[in-house]
């Protein structure tokens, strides 16, 4: 009998499978449709893949909300997906859910520029998918601003603040895509 470690399952397949398990009872916030949260997971991962990011970054994109929304620990992510994926997920997770929404968002933006590029890319892909969801909601499901506890102006300001911080980064097509997605929402 071999004493070697068992092979690790394919990273992306495993990331999507576990994201589906962990997000199983979660839905997007569309006002009139129950869209499974996996739609967002797939959207974020797809954006990262389309921009040529490494498999570990795409996997972290698929898992980007599991620490803050599902209570999954960094150690659990390390065990299943390795240190790099777990660290990227930690970088994009809000550290203290006991703070107010405003304080969490402010702190996240303040620390955006100190994060590794791959974590910044996951954040941008996450927000691109959120912006695209606002457009889809406006076209197919009704008033998109009903999805948010805070109104349109607060949300737009938050997205614009991220665009300003992203503009300080070296040029990348992902940043350009973020700007286009934001412009589409502002035009609604």
Model regions and ranges:
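Active-site helical microenvironments for divalent-metal-assisted chemistry
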Residues: 2-188
């Amino acid at each position: 009998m071999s004493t070697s470690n068992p092979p690790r399952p394919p990273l992306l397949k495993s990331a999507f499978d576990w994201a589906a398990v962990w997000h199983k009872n979660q839905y997007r916030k569309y006002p009139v449709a129950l869209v499974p949260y996996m739609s967002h997971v797939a959207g974020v991962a797809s954006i990262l893949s389309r921009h040529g990011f490494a498999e570990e970054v795409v996997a972290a994109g698929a898992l980007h909300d599991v620490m803050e929304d599902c209570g999954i620990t960094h150690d659990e992510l390390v065990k299943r997906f390795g240190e790099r994926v777990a660290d990227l997920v930690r970088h994009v997770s809000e550290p203290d859910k006991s703070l107010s929404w405003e304080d969490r968002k402010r702190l996240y933006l303040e620390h955006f520029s100190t994060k590794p590029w791959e974590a910044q890319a996951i954040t941008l892909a996450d927000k691109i998918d959120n912006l695209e969801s606002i457009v889809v909601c406006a076209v197919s499901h009704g008033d998109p601003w009903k999805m948010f506890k805070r109104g349109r102006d607060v949300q737009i300001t938050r997205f614009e603040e991220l665009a300003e911080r992203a503009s300080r980064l070296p040029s990348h097509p992902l940043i350009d895509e973020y700007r286009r997605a934001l412009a589409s929402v502002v035009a609604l």
